[in-house]
From Swiss-Prot:
Protein family according to the UniProt entry: Belongs to the FliE family.
Organism listed in the record: Yersinia pestis
Gene name of this polypeptide: fliE
Protein name: Flagellar hook-basal body complex protein FliE
UniProt KW keywords: Bacterial flagellum
GO MF term (any one): structural molecule activity
Amino acid sequence: MSVQGIEGVLQQLQVTALQASGSAKTLPAEAGFASELKAAIGKISENQQVARTSAQNFELGVPGVGLNDVMVNAQKSSVSLQLGIQVRNKLVAAYQEVMNMGV
């Protein structure tokens, strides 16, 4: 597992998060790995909160909230969470590989 592979997965996570938010923010030119990971986790949390809120609004009968919106938000949340889990798995595997290297 190479660092470039991990960075590629992290970039895919960032692109997915930006597309899900619908915003055209520019990424900082030089950001640290920890800050990028924290931002990605924050975006996953935000997606889950949006899905939870839309589901609650649908249950309460708030006008303008359709079942299709609830289902789309739930799927966005699910996909972003699964992607986050896969990134975590790759990071753990890379860490274990580095720890098993001989000195």
